[in-house]
A protein has these predicted regions:
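Glycine-rich, flexible loop motifs
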Residues: 1-49, 76-134, 236
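C-terminal auxiliary extensions adjacent to catalytic cores
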Residues: 2-34, 38-46, 72, 147, ...
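Polyanion/phosphate-binding surface patch
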Residues: 50, 65, 249-250
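FAD-binding core of FAD-dependent oxidoreductases
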Residues: 53-75, 82-105, 133-155, 164, ...
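Acidic, glycine-rich active-site loops and adjacent beta-strand->loop/helix elements
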Residues: 59, 85-86, 105-106, 126, ...
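Conserved, non-catalytic sequence blocks in retroelement Pol enzymes and Pol-derived host proteins
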Residues: 111, 140-142, 373
């Protein structure tokens, strides 16, 4: 049964990700009332002729142009048309759903003043997987993405459903809905705020939270194969370093490797291991710490009002506030930090891959080939990992520093939160592939071990899951299919179950 998440006060990043993956969204009565109350304030502002940005004025550099009441609905409509200028491949279904969920959450705070029927139409589209086609590029913050969503509400634009594209008008008709006629402020609210960034950022933090466990599992398997020493993840020496993430990684490794006879065989054979093994708690732990910090920022932003202007007061005493809550500076910085952390996690995984396949250090058949020389084995898949790590370094350049000036000097500082979140997701794609390569190599290395000593129970379990998906690499064959199979395993399952205790 598909779960339903009821929006009462705020949505968390976990909830946004769940909705993007298919959970249904509903409004509580309190949330509905907040939306109704805020709209009554906007109507009062319009009735009294109180000037409010984007309500009865132009936008951007045209903010001082007063718009007559008869033209305010046209302003809302025209904003969607003029701002629908995104380019590039459309966002995926999950990304679009995350943005829409974050958008609805922003309106439900009760400071935007958009009508309830607009929000309910967004929910109907989202819950029925009738998702607007959003060009992925062309936004320094949010405008073009939001406009693509808004077009569908008025019967324009396009939607994607069951792999097919339909017109916005047909999408609404399929749900028994009619195109909306937007009122004052609604066009601006639909393109405004940080939902694009918070939606994508919610996906990023949840995806990295999933992959850090797989990274620990991959490292544990590499530890066994390479005869690593156990002191670097022992509880007492790790306690000397103050980091929640580091302590968690140490605990995970101790649990994953408990009872490993294979690892016990290597005890004391080296004074210390190379950093790609010895520093796993420190690097993986730092990534976990960065993830916790980024998640805190994303959840804080989801709990915040990011519309401009915001409305408050009451119909008897309406107030409108022009501020910069739509600026996503905190999100941009957080996503840049998360992107760098994910790139670092991929980098240390690639170094472990090299040690698994490199005959100079592995103690295993060269490049994990069963017939070295005639067969190249895992030689070039390590090059693939190195290429992805190099790409990550380029992607990890901070988007939040890109700057720029738009809208006739009115928007003269840009924080690029949405591009920062988008490139963090691109880095996570590469990280997932690199981890899949390490896990595939680690399973191959286990099969080629000369020792008959047994693996830890948990690494044995992970090995069996890998082998259920991909067989031993006996003769050279195209490896990209194997890696894709392991990527699917990483996407769809957890590294271990809660009952296993890591």
């Amino acid at each position: 049964m598909v779960p339903t998440i009821t929006l009462d006060t705020v949505l968390t990043s976990d909830a946004i990700a769940a909705i993007a993956e298919g959970a249904k969204l509903a409004l509580s009565e309190k949330a509905r009332q907040r939306i109704l109350d805020a709209r009554a304030i906007v109507d009062a502002l319009v009735d009294r002729g109180i000037r409010g940005y984007g309500i009865n004025t132009g936008v951007g550099a045209l903010c001082d142009v007063v718009i007559d009441r008869e033209e305010q609905a046209s302003l809302s409509r025209n904003l969607l048309f003029s701002h629908s200028c995104g380019v590039g491949e459309p966002l995926g279904r999950v990304e679009t759903g995350a943005i829409m969920a974050a958008q609805i959450a922003n309106f439900a705070h009760g400071y935007s003043g958009i009508r309830l029927e607009v929000v309910e139409t967004l929910i109907a589209l989202l819950n029925n997987d009738m998702l607007p086609v959003i060009p992925s590029r062309g936004s320094v913050g949010y405008l073009t993405h939001g406009a693509a969503i808004g077009l569908v509400l008025i019967g324009s634009g396009e939607c994607s459903h069951d792999g097919k594209q339909v017109s916005g008008a047909d999408a609404l008709a399929a749900l028994g809905l009619k195109p909306l006629v937007l009122q004052a402020k609604e066009g601006l609210s639909l393109i405004n705020g940080t939902p694009c960034a918070t939606g994508l950022a919610s996906l990023a933090v949840n995806r990295l939270a999933h992959l850090v466990d797989w990274a620990d599992a991959a490292a544990a398997m590499s530890y066994e194969n390479l005869g690593a020493q156990t002191d670097p993840f022992a509880e007492m020496p790790l306690s000397l370093r103050k980091s929640d993430g580091l302590q968690q990684v140490g605990k995970n490794l101790r649990t994953l490797l408990a009872g490993s006879a294979l690892l016990a065989e290597s005890a004391g054979k080296r004074t210390q291991d190379p950093l790609s093994l010895r520093a796993v708690p420190h690097v993986h732990g730092a990534v976990r710490d960065a993830l916790a910090e980024a998640r805190a920022v994303v959840d804080r932003e989801l709990a915040s009002v990011t519309d401009n202007p915001a409305v408050s007061g009451s119909p008897a005493d309406p107030k409108v506030h022009s501020q910069a809550h739509a600026v996503g500076a905190a999100l941009g910085l957080a996503m840049d930090h998360l992107a760098t952390a994910a790139a670092e996690l991929a980098a240390i995984s690639e170094r472990r891959i090299d040690r698994l396949v490199n005959p100079l250090v592995s103690g295993l058949p060269a490049f994990l080939a069963s017939g070295s020389g005639v067969e190249s084995g895992f030689m070039i898949i390590q090059s693939t990992a190195a290429a992805l790590v190099a790409e990550n370094r380029r992607l990890a350049m901070p988007a939040s520093l890109d700057g720029g000036i738009t809208s006739g000097l009115q928007e003269d500082i840009l924080t690029h939160a949405t591009p920062a979140a988008a490139k963090a997701l691109a880095i996570l794609d590469n990280l997932e592939t690199v981890l899949a390569i390490e896990l595939t190599a680690a399973a191959q290395a286990h099969d080629l071990q000369s020792s008959k000593a047994t693996k830890a129970a948990m690494t044995q379990g992970i090995y069996e899951r890998l082998r259920h998906v991909v067989p031993f690499y006996r003769d050279d064959r195209p490896m990209n299919g194997d890696i894709q199979q392991i990527r699917t395993l990483l996407k769809t399952t957890t590294a271990w179950s809660e009952s296993e205790g890591a």
